[in-house]
């Protein structure tokens, strides 16, 4: 659906000499745990490689997670969070354009409690949210955390989608063994946007549905979902900024900007994965994909750097 790529192109910030730092996106990633340090890094560095100006990472001090992340890239602003204290994160929300919650979050009660408070605070100020990884398992335990918030994008893989389906079925009293369709889940949750990742990426808000079936790669290395989460977050922030600051955008877009942004992100990841696989084949890892973002972005959006 190249038409959706065309719809997204105007939302890409122009590279102008009179812009100041932050105008092309202030993104945050909340995640990481003593087991998973790579996930928030993949999300954050992908955001910067795509073109966001600033990326914060809120990561726990437990297990040296935040310290490890600080050594991975000087371009990322890493905030060590002591004892999963949400008050270390919430004051920053007003300065952000989007927050991505979940990459490498883990399943500790402290991390989940902190994430819940951050999501609630983000909702209170109408901040766009992308939920990925263990943040999806968190909301499966309490759908009210996200229900009705149409500025949320969920990016479940197959296992996470099944958990989400089971939780929504319980909420609506569906006792069948059937897996709900993503459109039904999105509708039941108040028309939030869902990106069901798979052989084809199904993107829906319950009212409209699009499918990204661009060629990707057959290799299934860890970290691809984290790259997508950071990419979705960045592109969603750009679309929000575009409609906020452009006076000639009164016309309602053909699709919700959450769907347009998510589709563009899925298409870019698939394209970069394909390019990486052509070089590295079976040895392809997530950093190979990230290293293709620069050229891959120019392939899809050739006018964006002019």
Curated annotation (Swiss-Prot):
CDD domains in the cross-refs: YXKO-related
Binding site for ATP: 197-201, 216-225
Similarity section: Belongs to the NnrD/CARKD family.
Its EC number(s): 4.2.1.93
The protein's enzyme class: lyase
Protein's name in the database: ATP-dependent (S)-NAD(P)H-hydrate dehydratase
Pfam families: Carb_kinase (PF01256)
Sample GO molecular function, one term: ATP-dependent NAD(P)H-hydrate dehydratase activity
Catalysis: reaction(s): (6S)-NADHX + ATP = ADP + phosphate + NADH + H(+); (6S)-NADPHX + ATP = ADP + phosphate + NADPH + H(+)
Natural source organism: Dictyostelium discoideum (Social amoeba)
Cofactor(s) required for function per UniProt: Mg(2+)
Role description: Catalyzes the dehydration of the S-form of NAD(P)HX at the expense of ATP, which is converted to ADP. Together with NAD(P)HX epimerase, which catalyzes the epimerization of the S- and R-forms, the enzyme allows the repair of both epimers of NAD(P)HX, a damaged form of NAD(P)H that is a result of enzymatic or heat-dependent hydration.
UniProt keyword Lyase, yes or no: yes
Record keyword Nucleotide-binding present: yes
Gene Ontology terms describing biological process: metabolite repair; nicotinamide nucleotide metabolic process
InterPro entries per record: CARKD, Ribokinase-like
Binding residues annotated for (6S)-NADPHX, in chain numbering: 104, 157-163, 226
């Amino acid at each position: 659906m190249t038409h959706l790529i065309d719809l997204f192109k105007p939302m890409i910030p122009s590279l102008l000499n009179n812009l100041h730092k932050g105008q092309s996106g202030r993104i945050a990633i909340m995640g990481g745990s003593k087991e998973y340090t790579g996930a928030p890094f993949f999300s954050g560095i992908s955001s910067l490689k795509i073109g966001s100006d600033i990326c914060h990472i809120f990561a726990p001090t437990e297990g040296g997670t935040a310290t490890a992340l600080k050594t991975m890239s000087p371009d990322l602003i890493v905030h060590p969070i002591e004892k999963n204290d949400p008050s270390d994160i919430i004051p920053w929300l007003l300065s952000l354009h989007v927050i991505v919650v979940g990459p490498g979050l883990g399943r500790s009660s402290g991390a989940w409690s902190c994430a819940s408070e951050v999501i609630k605070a983000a909702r209170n100020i109408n901040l766009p949210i992308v939920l990925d990884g263990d943040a999806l398992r968190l909301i499966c335990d309490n759908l009210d955390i996200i229900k009705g918030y149409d500025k949320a994008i969920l990016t479940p893989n197959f296992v996470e989608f099944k958990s989400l389906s089971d939780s929504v079925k319980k909420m609506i009293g569906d006792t069948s063994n059937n897996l709900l369709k993503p459109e039904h889940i999105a509708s039941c949750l108040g028309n939030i946007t869902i990106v069901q990742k798979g052989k084809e990426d199904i993107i829906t808000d319950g009212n409209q549905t699009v499918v990204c079936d661009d060629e990707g790669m057959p290799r299934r290395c860890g970290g691809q979902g984290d790259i997508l989460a950071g990419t979705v977050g960045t592109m969603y922030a750009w679309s929000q900024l575009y409609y906020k600051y452009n006076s000639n955008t009164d016309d309602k877009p053909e699709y919700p900007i959450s769907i347009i942004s998510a589709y563009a992100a899925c298409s870019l990841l698939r394209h970069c994965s394909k390019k990486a696989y052509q070089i590295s084949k079976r040895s392809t890892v997530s950093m190979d994909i990230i290293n293709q973002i620069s050229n891959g972005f120019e392939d899809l959006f050739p006018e964006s750097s002019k």
